[in-house]
Every structure is written in C-alpha cells, then in structure tokens.
Amino acid sequence: MEHPILFLNLLFEKLGLHVVGPEQAKSFGDFLLQPHVTYTWVVMLVLLGLGSMAAKGLEMVPKGAQNFFEVVITGIEDFMISITGEEGRFVFPLIASLGMFILFSNYLGMIPGFFSPTANINTTAACALISVVFTHVIGIKFHGVKYIKHFMGPVWWLTPLIMPIEIIGHIARVLSLSIRLFGNVFGEELVLGILFFLAGFYLAPLPMMFLGLFTGFIQAFIFCLLSMMYFAGAIEHAH
C-alpha cells in the first residue's frame, strides 16, 4: 500500500522515467524505480549522513548529546551481551545497523509523500535472510564443521527425523521475521493511506501516526531481539 502521492515517483515522472507497478515491472530498470527500492536508498543516505555528522563531532571527553548517546548505545550493547554472552559482542554493529535501518524505514512512511521500505515483503525478507544466514556464520565461526551436528539431533539414528525438522525450523525463522515486520508496517501504511485519502493531511491521521511511532519502535526491537536470540543459540551450540 502506497500513499496517494509519492514524491520520488513525481520526480521520476518529471525526468521522463515512467514508474510502473510491481506487476508490470519487467526490466531491471523498472525494478530499481520501485518505491521500496528508491526509499531504501533514502533511508541509507539519511543514516550515512547522520553517521558522518556524528563521527565529525566526537570528542575524547564526551558531553552533551554525545554523552547521552554513548550511554544509550552502551546500554543497548550490554543488553545484547546479556543475551549472547561476551562472545557475541562482535555482532553488535550488525544488530545496531539492522535496528536503525528498520526503525527509520518504519518511520519514513509516516511522512506524507514517502513510503516505508519495510511495508514491502522484499525488504523485510532481505533483512530476515541477513539475520538467519549470519546465525549460521556465527555457528561455523565458533564451532567449525561440527556445527552441523546441531541439525542432526542428540543421537545419530534420529538424524533422518531431526534434520528435516531443523531445516524447516530455520526456514520458518525467515518467514517469521519477514512476515511479522511486513504485516505490521503494511497494515499501518494501509490505514494511513486510507485516512490521508479521506481526510487529507490534517487531524484525522494523527492518532494512527502516534500509534505508528510506538509500533515502529516495537517492531524494530522485536526483530533485533529475535536476531540476538538466534545468534545466542548458535554461540551456545558452539560450546
């Protein structure tokens, strides 16, 4: 579900680039102009810009905003380590990057004329694949080839039964992460789009927008929390 008017689509039309719906997209160029792709670039540019500005203003003795954000980031990192253990500290940059990307993507669609990339299943599936694939990278990093024993069950003669169940379970993780995030953000986009269409950009959508601020944060938090738990499971099996 898209807002009635998307600014980037209008810009592309002015430049002579025709934006087609996902069903009509046939070429790679058509795919690159899809809203979930173009607004993903917007989110990435915003995050890169904020990161660059934050890096330039760093001081050895933190004060003001830097001090506040260092406390927040340290608290989040400590929370993650309480789940994954000290061995999982190295995955914090990935968790933080996924969390910031999902959070900003969730919030972007609340601005009239913009679209939430996470309201498209392709974006959420990509994030879920990163999380699940990296889970196995962690397992192999800590456990080597023996990590495959996790899929074989406690005794060898149960392998034909346990292995298919484990494989299905890991595929279900991708579906769970992607569909949960997509469904919640898409539902919010759907309601906002209807309210904007019926009542304009004024008071009617405000209650839903306040709810969207809360649910957008919760969905980003749940995605990161589940990813932490998957990473912790891979590290524990490595022990």
From Swiss-Prot:
Sorted UniProt keywords: ATP synthesis, Cell inner membrane, Cell membrane, CF(0), Hydrogen ion transport, Ion transport, Membrane, Transmembrane, Transmembrane helix, Transport
GO BP term (any one): proton motive force-driven plasma membrane ATP synthesis
Superkingdom: Bacteria
Gene3D superfamilies in the record: ATP synthase, F0 complex, subunit A
GO cellular component, one term: proton-transporting ATP synthase complex
InterPro entries with a match to the protein in the record: ATP_syn_F0_a_bact/chloroplast, ATP_synth_F0_asu, ATP_synth_F0_asu_AS, F0_ATP_A_sf
Compartment annotation: Cell inner membrane
Transmembrane segments: 31-51, 91-111, 125-145, 151-171, 194-214, 215-235
Membrane-topology descriptor: Multi-pass membrane protein
Nucleotide-binding keyword on record: no
Pfam families per record: ATP-synt_A
Example GO molecular function: proton-transporting ATP synthase activity, rotational mechanism
UniProt xrefs under HAMAP family: ATP_synth_a_bact (MF_01393)
Subunit structure: F-type ATPases have 2 components, CF(1) - the catalytic core - and CF(0) - the membrane proton channel. CF(1) has five subunits: alpha(3), beta(3), gamma(1), delta(1), epsilon(1). CF(0) has three main subunits: a(1), b(2) and c(9-12). The alpha and beta chains form an alternating ring which encloses part of the gamma chain. CF(1) is attached to CF(0) by a central stalk formed by the gamma and epsilon chains, while a peripheral stalk is formed by the delta and b chains.
Family: Belongs to the ATPase A chain family.
Function noted in UniProt: Key component of the proton channel; it plays a direct role in the translocation of protons across the membrane.
Protein name: ATP synthase subunit a
